[in-house]
Amino acid sequence: MVNINKLFIIILFFFFFFNILNKNKQIINSEININDITYLSKLKKVVYTILLGKNDNIHPIIKEKGYDYFMLTDQNIKNNSETNWTIINVDINKKYKSKKEKIKRQRFYKTHPHLFFKNYDLSIYIDAKYAIKGNLDEFLLRILTPKYYIYLLEHPNRSTINNELKAVAYFQKESRNLTRIIKKRYNEENFPDNNGLAETCLIVRKHNDLNCIDFMTQWYEEIKLYSHRDQLSFNYIYWKTRYKYVKYIPKKYTTEYFTQHAHIIKDIIK
């Protein structure tokens, strides 16, 4: 009798376990349309990251069919089968002397995929501290919709530009004088403080769209003129241009498909 009870409990456990698995599959499949799979398979897709200086380790990737992978770097790194990144060497050290100038140049590569990857339909930019751990096709099928061209994260810790300015000044990522100038300018233009705050370490773009190119160009000009902390200016440009094609990626998807590592040279601002 005892053995029968144990067997019943085991059967009941597996019944509920597989039922939960099946529900999760149904949830995923409900977000994936067969037409989207056909559409996605026709797109030329590129994943790229930027490694300037020695702030981060190189995180190897497992290549997925239908994607090309590029790393823009000033480091002496060769293409090799261990990392699977195709290296694009960029020499910024002669032309750009200060650390902030070099960071702003990094932002140029970050905001201009249409110049470097014009033969691709869709790009995925990931910060060098990110590693890919999940299936990218599945990730894209869960976030892409026809009417949006830019996809990125919402900031996990702050939601207003004033709080971000305070954090940047407190952790000395920019001078207090510059953060005051930015705040004054935004106030004069009536940029609302509660307009949201993006986190820009992961950006998916249909980067050849003309409106997307215009948005990215204006964003970079703002970075170049003011702060290299690009999260200070993204939502300002979003508001200023009245661009309607930005969509935030649910955080649960990024943790499912990407792993975030700490910088070697730790950036303590969160």
Each model region followed by its residue ranges:
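N-terminal Sec-pathway targeting helices
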Residues: M1-I10
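GT-A fold catalytic core of metal-dependent nucleotide-sugar glycosyltransferases
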Residues: T111-V168
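A residue-level signal for conserved active-site and pocket-lining positions in enzyme catalytic cores
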Residues: V47, Y69, H114, K129, ...
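Short acidic (Asp/Glu) patches
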Residues: E101-H112, E138, Y170-E188
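N-terminal anchoring/stem segment of glycosyltransferases
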Residues: I9-Q106, F116-Y120, L225-H228, K240-Y243, ...
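Short His-Asn-centered micro-motif
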Residues: Y48-L52, L72-D74, I126-A128, G134, ...
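Extracellular structured ligand-interaction cores
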Residues: K44, G66, Y125, E199-L202
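Catalytic core and acceptor-binding pocket of nucleotide-sugar-dependent glycosyltransferases
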Residues: Q172-K270
